[in-house]
Regions:
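C-terminal cap of thioredoxin/glutaredoxin-like
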Residues: 2-34, 112-113, 117, 121-212
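Structural alpha/beta surface segment adjacent to cysteine/selenocysteine redox centers
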Residues: 17-126
């Protein structure tokens, strides 16, 4: 079965919005998805900020231009989420999503079904502000809720998992990846869910006219 590589990050609302359409694309076109984490370094291009509980700015290292981009991004994502009955609540800080990403690598070893269940759980709860992706106990619970075995996860997180996560990120950047969601089809990079119709058209055309 043909494999499409998908880079994702749980702290990206755009990756959340792309998840289900990517599932549908794979099911329709008969391809396998190889989900890989790409942990975004948001402060490097959007600055950083932390909000109080009432939404006021507690600390900020953002320019006015960066604030406009961030505010528009959340408005745009909520607009799309509302059309699909999803909840996207703006975060109060920039989260380190690498722990949840290493959780993805852990459950991936236990099958596609538990990987989907884990991602569904983490994305939905995180964007409702119901899940702390920086808490290892919370991620262990998410692993169990997905039907995966969490025994040994902490050792994996501290050693092999962290090394694998960092190596995947470095390899992704060497291949040109800079954001999520990113899909790689036969070595060709597509960034953003707006390219899913093009990928679908390409895959279905190739499926209808297989190479001799």
């Amino acid at each position: 079965m043909r494999t499409i590589t998908v880079y994702t990050d749980y702290k990206s609302p755009y990756a959340y919005l792309a998840k289900d359409p990517i599932y549908a694309l794979a099911d329709e076109c008969g391809v396998r998805l190889d989900w890989l984490p790409y942990t975004l370094d948001i402060p490097s291009y959007l600055g950083s900020a932390e909000l109080n509980a009432d939404g006021s700015v507690a600390r900020s290292q953002r320019t006015a231009h960066q604030w406009r981009r961030v505010r528009y991004a959340y408005m745009d994502c909520r607009r799309q989420a509302n059309k699909r009955g999803l909840t996207i609540r703006g975060t109060r800080k920039i989260w380190d999503s690498s722990l949840a990403a290493i959780g993805l690598l852990w459950v991936k070893r236990q099958g596609d079904a538990v990987l989907r269940a884990y991602s569904d759980h983490v994305f939905e709860r995180f964007w409702k502000r119901e899940l702390d992706i920086e808490d290892v106990a919370v991620i262990e619970t998410a692993i169990g809720a997905a039907g995966a075995d969490a025994a040994g996860f902490r050792d994996y997180l501290a050693g092999e998992g962290r090394e694998e996560h960092d190596a995947i990120r470095a390899a992704a950047e060497s291949a040109g990846v800079f954001g999520v969601p990113s899909l790689v089809v036969d070595g060709e990079l597509y960034w953003g869910r707006e390219h899913l119709p093009d990928i679908r058209e390409r895959l279905l055309a190739e499926k209808a006219s297989p190479a001799p």
